[in-house]
């Protein structure tokens, strides 16, 4: 059995175009705001907003400005927590809302990393709008599952997997031929999620999750061609922490009894 080239082509991300990430321009420095009425606390809230932009120039200015604040950040954090308590009347809200207050360097590192990941995503998709538009693979899965009744009160995939398998089997470009195809498809979905996450996306669409789950289920049904392919599946299951999934015992049995030479 050969790899499904139509499947591979559909489940491939756009190539990297470094010049396409220019839509992430340096923003203006956020304007200071009166939030709590406490000048020092409000100053830190403003500096945190500057840091969250993820742009090095604004971060450098914020970190330099923070040196002029003489009150310990821990004390300012307590004052901010007290403000939140007065506003919301909830000690839990106050505790969580003031958590990490004033930890500008840590926040800066996180913001820079998030911005780096955004650049990577936009180097493939050009704009945030394109990034969140249905990819050709998503559109194909959505079309294939049109009319399939969804199951209520399901935590993850809310399609019945038998119907999903029947629908995808009718579309050669959605059906993996080999275990390597299955891994390719799952890698596509995981990478797409990874590219979208820095922009604050939620869960994958149900039709995308259905195909990811279908590829995983097919790992138990397609015979391995070689020892190397079996090992690749084992490594994949360990890497994605899928050993506890319902299909995993059948997958392991398939890898052992597959008859590869």
PLM features: what roles do these ranges have?
Residues 1-261:
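Sequence/structural signature of long amphipathic alpha-helices
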